[in-house]
């Protein structure tokens, strides 16, 4: 089978290369801009950088978050009530970059359309962003974004799920750059006690067609889960658990991030 090789222009490629050299997965932490307020959310993202997160996913709160679990949905509501704007997310990306971190934005597609696809790509590049995670955008409908991301050297992170057909998987992986975001179901996110067994098979399916890095979002909330997923994935993505920890304050967030960072460094091979 032909293997799709990742473009050398990937902004996040060197991050994954560095982690592989350390024989570990990358830790990718998600927080929404504006929770519990904009300044605290930015401080929290910088805490993640300082606590060992290799990539920060900066969320754009959206009023119709169809794929968010209850923890992130509640945080998004708080952020929207506080008046958060897309420009606050771009400012957060800039702050992360200035702190020595690497940021990607995670957003539903509608806010980008409203902002303007080309303008958003331009401003994300200017802020020091590395790419965009688009959970509700499929490559077939992403022509404008693909063109803008090429112009502004931004990585494109699309989602794959166990339900992805072979054709859909190849199409999605081929359109992605930086990493592919693997989920257990194409649906709601959230922390879980047990990690799914179908996702290692999904990662293997991606690896059969491409050398792109694969990040896994599976509701991770413990060092042990981070170690387990880090045994087969290139990146361990944590969202809901970090949002919950932030609800208890920055010290709790830092403690969890440090625990997860230790987890990816003691990967457990299946």
Swiss-Prot record:
Catalytic activity annotation: (1S,2R)-1-C-(indol-3-yl)glycerol 3-phosphate + L-serine = D-glyceraldehyde 3-phosphate + L-tryptophan + H2O
Keyword Magnesium part of the UniProt annotation: no
Example GO molecular function: tryptophan synthase activity
PROSITE patterns xref list: TRP_SYNTHASE_ALPHA
Active site: 57, 68
Transmembrane segments: none
UniProt keywords, alphabetically: Amino-acid biosynthesis, Aromatic amino acid biosynthesis, Lyase, Tryptophan biosynthesis
GO CC, one annotated term: cytosol
Pathway(s) per entry: Amino-acid biosynthesis; L-tryptophan biosynthesis; L-tryptophan from chorismate: step 5/5
Pfam annotation, one family: Trp_syntA
EC number: 4.2.1.20
Subunit structure: Tetramer of two alpha and two beta chains.
Biological role: The alpha subunit is responsible for the aldol cleavage of indoleglycerol phosphate to indole and glyceraldehyde 3-phosphate.
Similarity comment: family membership: Belongs to the TrpA family.
Name under which the protein is recorded: Tryptophan synthase alpha chain
Organism of derivation: Mycobacterium leprae (strain TN)
Gene: trpA
């Amino acid at each position: 089978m032909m293997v799709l090789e990742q473009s050398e222009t990937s902004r996040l490629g060197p991050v994954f290369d560095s982690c592989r050299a350390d024989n570990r997965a990358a830790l990718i932490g998600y927080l929404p801009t504006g929770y519990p307020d904009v300044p605290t959310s930015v401080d929290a993202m910088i805490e993640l950088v300082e606590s060992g997160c290799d990539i920060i996913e900066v969320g754009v709160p959206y009023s119709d978050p169809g794929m968010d679990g209850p923890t992130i949905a509640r945080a998004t509501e708080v952020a929207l009530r506080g008046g958060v704007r897309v420009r606050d997310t771009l400012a957060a990306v800039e702050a992360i970059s200035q702190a020595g971190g690497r940021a990607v934005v995670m957003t539903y597609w509608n806010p980008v359309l409203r902002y303007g696809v080309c303008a958003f790509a331009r401003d994300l590049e200017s802020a020091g962003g590395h790419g965009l995670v688009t959970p509700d955008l499929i490559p077939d409908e992403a022509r404008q974004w693909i063109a803008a991301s090429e112009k502004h050297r931004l990585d494109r992170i699309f989602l794959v799920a166990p339900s992805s057909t072979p054709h859909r998987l190849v199409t999605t992986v081929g359109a992605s750059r930086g990493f592919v975001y693997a989920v257990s179901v194409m649906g709601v996110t959230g922390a879980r006690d047990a990690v799914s067994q179908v996702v290692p098979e999904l990662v293997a399916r991606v690896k059969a067609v491409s050398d792109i890095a694969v990040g896994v979002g599976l509701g991770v909330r413990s060092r042990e889960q981070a170690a387990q997923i880090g045994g087969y994935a290139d990146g361990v993505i944590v969202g809901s658990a970090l949002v919950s920890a932030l609800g208890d304050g920055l010290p709790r967030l830092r403690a969890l991030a440090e625990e997860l960072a230790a987890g990816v460094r003691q990967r457990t091979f299946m």
